[in-house]
Amino acid sequence: MRATSSLFALIGLAALGACTQESETGESNYLNLCAGCHGDDGRGAGPAADSLEATPADLTLIAARNGGAFPMVEVMSKIDGYAKGEEHHGAMPAFWPLLEGRTVLVQTGDGILTPTPEPLVELAEYLRSIQRSEAE
């Protein structure tokens, strides 16, 4: 019984460590690839923002602009360049580092699990973690 409890505790700690690592990796990729335009806080006021044709989006209000739900698949499609919306007035930098390496299966909402680059998923998860309401 004691060995079983210890095993479950170790599994729980390993899962917690994986969540922390995912958050750190997503945040690190955000700071390296996105903060220049969107700012360290994601609100659209990065150091390069003034030199751009259009103001970068406030990435902390993605869910608020989507009725409170974070549109994970759409966010990943914007990041990797697959979906280019009318509101985006210029090319985002190449995010090829997010498209390399290991893939994980992501539920895309249509019942299909889609292999997706893990760094892309981690970045989208980080963006989900910084969401706020418009009132904040």
Where are these regions (language model features)?
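Electrostatic cytochrome c docking/interface patches
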Residues: A14-N29, R65-G67
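Sec-exported extracytoplasmic/periplasmic mature domains
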Residues: A35, D80-K84, P97, R128-A135
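Detector for the c-type heme attachment site
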Residues: E22-S23, C37-R43, P97, R128
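Short Fe-S-cluster ligation motifs
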Residues: N66-I79
